[in-house]
Curated annotation (Swiss-Prot):
The lineage of its organism: Eukaryota, Viridiplantae, Streptophyta, Embryophyta, Tracheophyta. HAMAP family: ATP_synth_b_bprime. Belongs to the ATPase B chain family. This is ATP synthase subunit b, chloroplastic. It is a single-pass membrane protein. In plastids the F-type ATPase is also known as CF(1)CF(0). The keyword Transmembrane helix applies. CDD domains: ATP-synt_Fo_b. It holds the Pfam family ATP-synt_B. One of its GO terms (molecular function) is proton-transporting ATP synthase activity, rotational mechanism. The keyword Thylakoid applies.
């Protein structure tokens, strides 16, 4: 024990000449070093321990937050995938319905065009029949006029004034008979 106290006393006598000396006395140097290290650990250990605890809590808090964010991100990813699948199915459905709608519209357009062509064909046929009938009537009228003119020409060339007077008298006589019958 005397050596320990002597080593503390000898600390005060060291010269500050700037040179380090090698103390080979193990018993004198180890307790001093140990006491300094223990003192530093005890003095600064509480602060370091608190600092490490705070750091540990921040790291754990960051890990928990990261795990929560990861969980939310995974959840959002699953929702997005489900929505993408749903939208994909709806797109396929719209595509199929669109194609069937296009086919239906195409069929309706073809049917409407066919009906229009059929109506136009009927109208054309009616117009042709009407024009044929009109042409036939014009030909009949022309033939009748020509026949009438021919008959009048024949009558005028064959009639003389005596035949003409007899025809007029016969017609007047027929009119008189008709008048008597009706009265």
């Amino acid at each position: 024990m005397k050596n320990v106290t002597d080593s503390f006393v000898s600390l005060g006598h060291w010269s500050s000449a700037g040179s380090f000396g090698l103390n080979t006395d193990i018993l004198a140097t180890n307790p001093i070093n140990l006491s300094v290290v223990l003192g530093v650990l005890i003095f600064f250990g509480k602060g370091v321990s608190d600092l490490l605890d705070n750091r540990k809590q921040r790291i754990l808090s960051t890990i928990r937050n990261s795990e929560e964010l990861r969980g939310r991100a995974i959840e959002q990813l699953e929702k997005a995938r489900a929505r993408l699948r749903k939208i994909g199915m709806e797109a396929d459905e719209f595509r199929v319905n669109g194609y069937s709608e296009i086919e239906r519209e195409k069929e309706n357009l073809i049917n409407a065009t066919y009906n229009n062509l059929e109506r136009l064909e009927n109208f054309k046929n009616e117009t042709i029949r009407f024009e044929e009938q009109r042409a036939i009537n014009q030909v009949r009228q022309r033939v009748f006029q020509q026949a009438l003119q021919g008959a009048l020409g024949t009558l005028n060339s064959c009639l003389n004034s005596e035949l003409h007077l007899r025809t007029i008298s016969a017609n007047i006589g027929m009119l008189g008979t008709i008048k008597e019958i009706t009265d």
